[in-house]
Amino acid sequence: MATSAAVKDEPATQFAKDQLKAIIERIERLEEEKKTISDDIRDVYAEAKGNGYDVKALRTIVRMRKQDADERAEQETILETYLQALGML
C-alpha cells in the first residue's frame, strides 16, 4: 500500500501538480491582463468625457455595435412600441 509520501513522488502526480499550477498561473496572468484592459477602457471613456462626449451614449453605441442587425432592429422596434404606449413619442 502506498503511503501519502510515496504518492507525492509519483511522476503522474507530479505531472498533475505541475499542470494544475500552470493552469492557475495562466488564469492569474489573464485576470491581470483583463484588469489592465478594463483600466484602459475606463481611461478612454474618461478621455471622451473630457472631450465633451456623453459616455452613456458611447457605451450604448458600443453595446449596439456588438449586436447583429436583426437583433438591434428588434430591440429598437420594441423600444419604440413601449415609448409610444407611454405617450413619449
UniProtKB/Swiss-Prot annotation:
InterPro entries documented for this protein: GapR-like, GapR-like_DNA-bd
An example Gene Ontology molecular-function term: DNA binding
Domain of life: Bacteria
Family named by the database record: Belongs to the UPF0335 family.
Protein's name according to its UniProt entry: UPF0335 protein RPE_4107
UniProt organism field: Rhodopseudomonas palustris (strain BisA53)
